[in-house]
Amino acid sequence: MYMLYLNSDQFAEALERIDTVVLPIGMTEAHGHHCPLGTDVIIPRRFLELIEERMGDELIIAP
């Protein structure tokens, strides 16, 4: 569950039942002319989306 999409009430409720918050981080840098600058940010976010699909609402993905 992406924290960015929750309102403050939903976030407070989620924190009462979820004990895992993950912060995907990465550098913004060039990886050649063929890759986007955000490659190191895009990959961890996608990885967490796949984990979320398996875990359901058992983790919060922080911005």
Regions found by a protein language model. Give the residues of each.
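N-terminal catalytic or cofactor-binding beta/alpha core of small enzyme domains
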Residues: 2-63
